[in-house]
């Protein structure tokens, strides 16, 4: 008899989650003030371009060194923000702009709450195609960005860390290096939980039903198990030891090692915040510069 009552309860919980989700959207606070931290010898611009994949205009922030020689092309690092953030976050909450002084273009796209994937139930929300096709084409058309895999890298925090690793595994021909900082790598494989029903509903819209093909196609663990170690971008992973995301990061680091996929993993002190992420930047960029093609 108890089992007969489960379905109505789940339906009720889903209904409540939908109502709460609608209320949340109406009560969304305005974005925080934009106060980018710029280095002395860099130039910053905010760009809006039309994404064919999303069929709407999307913004991105770009930071370049000021002393670019004529006709010179520079490598590009795409920086993905976390959930609840926006394309200003990297330049507002870190001093990442200083790395552009080393002959590097930094591109920070708007990712909304997409996990940088093509949504399962919304054909118009093709965020993977927006990043991997539209954004890169716009950057390489309008800025001195060197084309080709040896000149491209991708890095992200939290949701953006998931996006960076997922995109690198799905498109090994696009990137030479990918870094995931405090990455939410296990989101597609998390089972249903009443305690997180609203989050599960959001994720189901992005990744599809539990154990669906779409969900498996965007699961970094599934992708890592089938990846070609000779073609996979170099993967840099780090995670704070006080984070709930640490176990999943440890697990995928072990999987990458077992599969002989070039990678490194650096757990360290800290929680899921910019204090910890900023402490990891020097090490992450040292690894990045060791793999990018720079002339």
Model-predicted regions and their roles:
Residues 1-10:
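Bacterial N-terminal signal peptides that target proteins for export
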Residues 9-17:
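Sec-dependent N-terminal signal peptides
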Residues 20-22:
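C-terminal motif of bacterial Sec signal peptides marking the signal peptidase cleavage site
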Residues 24-295:
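Non-catalytic cap/lid and distal C-terminal segments of serine-dependent acyl enzymes
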């Amino acid at each position: 008899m108890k089992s007969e009552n489960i379905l109505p309860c789940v339906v009720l919980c889903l209904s409540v989650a939908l109502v709460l989700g609608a209320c949340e959207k109406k009560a969304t606070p305005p974005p925080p003030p934009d106060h980018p931290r710029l280095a002395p010898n860099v130039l910053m611009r905010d760009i809006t371009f039309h994404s064919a994949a999303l069929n709407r205009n999307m913004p991105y922030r770009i930071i370049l060194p000021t002393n670019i020689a004529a006709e010179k092309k520079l490598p590009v690092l795409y920086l993905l923000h976390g959930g609840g953030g926006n394309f200003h976050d990297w330049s507002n909450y870190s001093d990442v702009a200083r790395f552009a002084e080393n002959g590097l273009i930094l591109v920070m796209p708007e990712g909304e709450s997409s996990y940088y994937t093509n949504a399962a139930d919304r054909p118009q929300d093709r965020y993977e195609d927006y990043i991997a096709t539209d954004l890169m084409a716009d950057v390489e058309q309008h800025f001195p960005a060197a084309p080709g895999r040896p000149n491209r890298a991708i890095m992200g925090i939290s949701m953006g860390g998931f996006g960076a690793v997922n995109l690198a595994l799905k498109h090994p021909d696009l990137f030479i290096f990918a870094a995931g900082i405090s990455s939410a790598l296990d989101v597609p494989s998390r089972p249903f939980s009443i305690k997180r029903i609203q989050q599960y509903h959001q994720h189901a819209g992005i990744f599809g039903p539990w154990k669906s093909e779409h969900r498996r196609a965007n699961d970094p663990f599934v992708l890592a198990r089938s990846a070609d170690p000779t073609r996979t971008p170099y993967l840099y992973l780090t995670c704070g030891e006080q984070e709930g995301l640490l176990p999943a990061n440890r697990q995928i680091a072990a999987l990458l090692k077992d599969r002989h996929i070039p990678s490194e993993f650096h757990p360290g002190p800290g929680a899921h915040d910019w204090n910890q992420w900023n402490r990891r930047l020097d090490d992450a960029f040292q690894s990045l510069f060791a793999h990018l093609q720079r002339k």
